[in-house]
Each structure stands twice: as structure tokens, then as C-alpha cells.
Amino acid sequence: MDGDRHHGDRGPVHARDRDLIRSRIGTGHASLNLVPRVAQSRMRAPVARGSLLRPGTGSKGSHCEQGLGRGREGMAQSVRSPIGSTFTTMERASMESVFGRRLRGLIAVPLLATLLGAAQAETVIRYGISLADIPLTTGQPDRGAGAYQFTGHTIYDPLIAWEANVDTRPGKLIPGLATDWKVDPKDQKVWRFTLRKGVKFHDGSDFKADAVVWNLAKVLDDKSPQFDAKQAAQVKPRIPSIASYKVIDDYTVEITTKDVDALFPYQLPWFLISSPAQWEKVGRDWAKFASTPSGTGPFKLDKLVPRERADLVRNAAYWDKTRLARVDRLVLVPIPDALTRANALLNGQVDLIETPPPDVVPQLQSSGFRIVQNVTPHVWPYHFSTYPGSPWTDIRVRKAANLAIDRDAIVKLLNGLASPAKGQLDKTSPWFGKPTFDIKYDLPQARALMAQAGYSKANPIKAKVIIAQGGTGQMLSLPMNEFMQQSLAEIGIDVEFEVVELETLYLHWRSGAKADMNAGKGITAINLAYVTADPFYALTRFEYSKYVAPNGVNWGGYANPQVDAAIDKIKTTFVAKDQDALLAYIHQQMVDDALMIWVVHDTNPHALSPKVKHFVQAQHWFQDLTTIGL
């Protein structure tokens, strides 16, 4: 074959792998390094009739041509599976990096000379991240919640922050650019924020109340001159409660919510504040601002090369002296392929990576690399559409789908880097409640429910699910989805996939199941990993009928009057223990209604080279990159 070259007994080196590595990291001599692939034998059942991961199909072009070179544009391609699967080369290679033939060797990543060329006086750490591109740097990152740790909470600060520099317990809300926030006892829709004094943006301008209101208009007021549709698309669904805002004085801001909402503070860690002065300086151009951004965060952006790297340098003048960065320079290197990331780490081209391939973890550990993971508020689900015409409107089908999944087998597939899900939340959560529907692997019960609904393996119901090629938080998207496809086929659910780039998946998610881009293509479920750290992010945004897309991210149109009543009540409940009781009831109803297929909770693993001595793995999807040090 033209794409294979053999090097002694170390197995084939594929041209597509070599092209990807060179396009991502650089050029140079490539050595070989033993990195095993996940074997198909770890699947619970053999692939039948062809599958999502079927080798030997795909369109022409290298990884670089098909994926990396397209920047922020999506790569939506309809994928029919089983029978007649078609994929881009990038998709196929990503799949084969986990399944297909076991390779005994993989090309090593060439030395990235430009990354090693930093001044020796600097302390530098290079971080291989799982995204295909650097997230937006203008203030509101794209590419999902995980991107906030890279170009969000590094360059910028929120009014209210998440405590992400502790690993022994869940973090909590803490003061950010606001030192205090209170609800008006006379009108509980009004919140007053006292701002931190003495804070400066990276450009030297002062942070004051005008900047807060200016930034709110930037994402909420499409008539304002600074409005940025790209940033608004990222954050507007995350701050749905805001109705209006105004300056009281230089260090006081008032925000009014649409309704009384005791949970409103949980929305504000997502709202980050850019410098109005810098925007003016670059000619009121957000594209230019992206190259020379200015926030108040612990890092400054020194260099940005789209799809290649972002250099963050320590902000020595950062206002929070307890959170100064441990290194002078942190280089973010997008490496979306998991095996390529692992080889970059093994060969010294990066110093730490996120989401190492599960089968490579033993080799990394035996080579002296440290694997760090922790309890993580995160779930990997299928989120159903419950609109008329969807195959998931029948609760028997939704419950059967949950009972068809062998979650222990998926955890084994992931080499233990996950835990089985019993719902949206981990059972240890105070908000788990007491659901009557016990989510487990029970194939006979699943088949019985499908029979009651009128379906079987011989007479299947068809469903189309939109999924990501990969990306931060999506775990091993393609092999896990093949496992799901096979498992659901066993009970009479014939799944077809639409495979897209992660940012495109987010567009489909924000638009809602009823949107033409979903309903028009027959898409009735979405596989998108969710952060579940707080009441809003874990529960209410998915269940409240007032948050049906595009007003929020109740993607599937779920509406339960009892749940709505509980959410209305919690929004007027300011006592924590009473909130906990209501949240437990809400989660209990969510599980009993089988709103999603809940599969596993991620443990958010990172692999660190021996030179990295410091890294606090928070019990959160946000990680504080200031804790990384030599």
C-alpha cells in the first residue's frame, strides 16, 4: 500500500500519521516509539454489518487537508452506519487510532524547535491540548466548556469565580472581580455587585464598573457598537437570567434578572471581561483584538498561531498574589489525536497532555510519567429530543436504551479512566435524590420494554445521533459511540451518526432539536459531554421549559410541569439546604423520565512528564493553569 512504510519489526508507519504530526508540530526526523492501540477485542461484541469504525473507507486528503486546515469552520458530513459508511481521512484515522489493526509502533513527534527556542532564563511548560484549534481569545472562548481553562480564565477574570486550585474537595464560588454580591431584599430580581479596586487590564487601563456594563452589552445587546456575535453565541445561553444592567458608581454594578433567581450567581463564572480601551486601540476590531487581547487575568497572550500554538506569559502584576502563575511561559499546543499527543509527551515535545489514550497509560507510567485524575463533575450522555416524531418520545424506548448499555465494559475500554453513570450526577452528590428508575445493564428488561413499544432486533426503530470527532470533554468519542451503536442494535435501535467537528456540534446544540439543522436532517439525539458542577449547569438548564433552545440549552424540548414548579420554587429559595432538597427532587424526576442515556462520568486524566512537579487537579472541569509548575 502507498500509505504504509515498514521499519524493521516495529510495524507500519502510516503516511497520514506522519502528515498529521508534521502539520501540527513541525518537520524533522521521526523516530519510532512503542504505543499500543486499543484492541477491538475489548469491545463487548464484534462489529456486525460494518460500523462507524469500519476501516478502508473515506474521502481523499490528509488529516491536515480534511480537518486542521479548515480552522473554525465545521466539517459536518452525513455518516451512514452500519452499511455504506463514509468518512473523511481525518475521521477514519482518528477511529483507527483506537480501533482497527493494532500497531506495534507509531511515528514519534519531531522535535518542535520553535517551542524549545524560548530564552533559557524563562521557565516554560508546553501543554498538549485535545482541541483542533486554539479557542477564541477575545474574552468568551469557543470550543466548549473545557476551553475556558485555556483562553478564558487564563487571560480574563469573571465577576464571580470557581475555586479551581484545590483537589481534596469540590470547589465553590469565590470572589473574582466582584468582592461581594447581594440580592436586594425589596426586589429579589436586583443584584448589586461591589467591584474590586486597584485592578488593571493588561493594557494598563483601569477596571471599573463601566467595563462590566460594556462587556455585558458586548454579548447581550446587538445594537451596541462593541457587540460581537461570536462571543455572544458562546455565553448568551450560559447567562439566560440577565434582563438589564447599569452602573451605580465606579465600583458598583447592578444586574436585574428576568425573574427572581437564587441560582443566578452560578451563571457568572462564564462571563469574562475584556478591555474596552484595548478594543478602541485596535480600531474597534474584534479580529485584531484576538491577536493582542487584554484582560485582567494571570496570563497575557504573547503569541497566537491559529491551529498551532498560543503562548501565554505570566502576568507579574496580577491582582491576586495567591494565584500568580508558577511558570513564565505556558505554550498551548493543539493536538487533537490522542496517540499523537501521547507520543509528543513520550518524546519530549510537550510536558503534559490532557486525555491520554487509555491503553497508553501503563506505558506512560512505566516510562516515569505521572497520571493525575480526580472526581469530576462531568457526564457523557445521549441527550434526546422529545418533540413529536422523535423515536425517543416513548419513555419505554428511552429507558430500554439506558438498560442496553454495559457501562462497566466502557469503563474497561477506557482503562478505568471513568466511572459508570447512574444519572446526570454522581451518586455521592447531595442533589442525586432517590430515583425509582435504576440505571444498570439489563438486556432482558431492555428487550422487554422495546417489545412493549412494538420494536425488536428484527423490527428496529431508527434514530440519528449527531456526535463529535473528538475534543476536550468528549473522551474517546468515536470508539465509545461505536460501542453505543452496537449495544443499541442489540435491542432494536438502529443508530445512524452524523459526525462533525466539536465546534459545529455546539452550534447544533445551541440551536435546539427543533432547528432545521437538526430536525431537517432527522437528528433526534446529540452526544455532547456536560459539565455538572453546579445546579444551573447540571440540572435546571436542561429541564426548565423556559430554557428551550434558543432561549437556553433545553435541547430536546423537555417539559414537565412538576419540574418547572420545583425550578420556580428553587429560584426563590435562598437557603442552601432547602435548595439541596429541591435539586434532589429535580434530578430524581430527570432520571425517572430518562431524559438522556447517561453513560459514564469522566475523571479528566492528565499525563505529566517528570519535569512537571506541580499541578493541582481540581474536582471540576475547569483547571487552574496557574498551578502548573516545574
Regions found by a protein language model. Give the residues of each.
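Extracytoplasmic/peripheral linker and loop segments enriched in polar/acidic and small residues
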Residues: 399, 411, 494-507, 537-610
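Ligand-site clamp/hinge motif
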Residues: 287-290, 317-363, 494
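Gly/Pro-rich hinge or "lid" segments in bacterial periplasmic/extracellular proteins
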Residues: 163-168, 269-325, 329, 339, ...
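Ligand/substrate-recognition segments at binding pockets and active sites
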Residues: 127, 306, 451-530, 541, ...
